[in-house]
Amino acid sequence: LHSLKKRFAGKIKSIIIDPPYYFKKTKSSDAFNYNSNFKLSTWLVFMKNRLDVAKEMLSDEGLCIIIIGEEGYAQLKLLADNILGGDKYIGTISWRKSDNQANIGEFAKVTDYILIYKKSSGKLNKLPLTDKARKEYRYSDENGYFRRQILLDKTRGKYNYELTTPTGKKLYGPWMKEKEEIERLDNLGKIYWTRGGQEQPYGKLYLQDSEGQIPNDFWDNSFGTNQRGAEEIRELFSGDRLFDFPKPERLIYNLIKISSEEGDLVLDFFMGSGTTVAVAHKMNRQYIGIEQMDYIETVAVERLKKVIDGEQGGISQDVAWSGGGSFIYAELM
């Protein structure tokens, strides 16, 4: 990471990392293929040293995204606030990481947390509309499908004036838009009038004009689960369970979607099974992946080769991936 700092300082649009988690209780086995038995102070120093460099590498529009478990979340949030800036904190996504839950112990933990920070002027992109959101566009006219936009709102409206309906009924607000704007939209055919006793105007928000929907702070298992991530690895490597908790391509796809555009540079310095770089490749992003463990050659590098050959797992069909491209693999001696 330090060897790349000078060349790529201020050039990274999206940093997405899934670092070793902190655990309060010692693990008998290395659940994450990293040292999972840090003392809290050691783990925080470990993270601080890397976040310091990460901040330097972000562009002014860049975003830093960190995936972490519940046990280390509070401490990492304080550390990241200190390094990246509490005023640069955008929010935390709670991600349902499991298809099911264990019914043993006292409390089932089925979510991980995704912290999002901006360097300076960075902002999140919108996500594609879900099937549920698309169903809201159930009205149609000659211009296409649309959903209704509330204009008469007695709670939030701030404009008071008289408006006459097509049948001559008088409405008095309060309105969400100024009278001149509603009249302009009506003249353009962009007002939907209900009929009957509840006659009132609504704006028309067309499906084809939608740029998507803003991200929210809870992502359910439609964004993928750890089980799905493990299945993707097994499908790539002849059924071998190489990682216990790899992130699914669907989750990383959405994180890359909200934090970058095509051609932008994505960095993951805890590359692990290579999910982030594989998804970045399929999404036409530039990327840098860093991994200190020996399995980089047998897992991440081999996975990228399969991506170039056109493998059809993960998000491939959703993005019409058919293969191609290249990458450079180098070892720091």
Predicted regions and their residues:
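Extracellular structured ligand-interaction cores
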Residues: D112-I114, N160, N284-Y287, S326
